Amino acid sequence: MLGPYLNGGKVGVIGYSAGGETALILSGARPDLDRLRKYCLERPNDADACKTHGVLIADRSELVPEADQRVGAVMLMAPLSLLFGRHALAGVQVPALIYSGDSDQLVAVDRNAEALARKLPVTPDYRLLAGAGHFVFMAHCDAEQSVRMPALCKDAAGVDRRHIHHSLQREAAVFFSQALGAPQPAERSAASGAPRQQQR
């Protein structure tokens, strides 16, 4: 629906956790399932990463990993990036801003965000958040959610989720403005075949 209005090369993508894989694929990365299978042999207890045993499960058979040339920058938060070595990341030629918590117990920082920051062909801006866990990037919980989902809602002592989110918003705005240029009103793409209305 929004595709015809996207300015080519001016699209910024934000990916969190497994969404980081999606953002990387859209920006030119090629999934390498052999890497995931090898990782799961080394760390079989990582149930979240290895529950499919290195098999890529698509919602529909026609879905295939494909880059989108309109993507001009990516912001990744606690990205799951086990699928990508240097060769698989060679096609990612856009600026990247990466955040991860140094106390992430769900997505191993050393094999994901940290390794990704070393391997991307365009050196990213990599920021490690002291004391933060995997779920610090999720919305602040209300009282009921804190009781029902404590693992998702409780942060370590000294970690202020609201403050982190405010910082992320400011830093993301600066990053995307620098990477993509100042925001401009998007017009319907001529490639969509729809005529543009003339202003009078």
Language-model regions, residue ranges each:
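Gly/Ser-rich "nucleophile elbow"/oxyanion-hole loop immediately N-terminal to the catalytic nucleophile
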Residues: M1-S17, E21, D32, E62-E66
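Hydrolases whose catalytic domains are alpha/beta-hydrolase-1, hotdog thioesterase
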Residues: T22-L26
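A conserved short beta-strand
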Residues: L33-V55, E66-P79
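Acidic catalytic loop of the alpha/beta-hydrolase fold
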Residues: L82-L83, S103-V107, H134-F135
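Short beta-strand/loop motif that positions the catalytic acidic residue
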Residues: V92, I98-S100
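Short alpha-helix in the alpha/beta-hydrolase fold that links the catalytic acid
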Residues: V94, A108-K119, C141
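Catalytic histidine neighborhood in serine/cysteine hydrolases
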Residues: K119-C153
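Catalytic active-site module of serine/aspartate enzymes centered on a nucleophile-bearing elbow/loop
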Residues: A143-R200
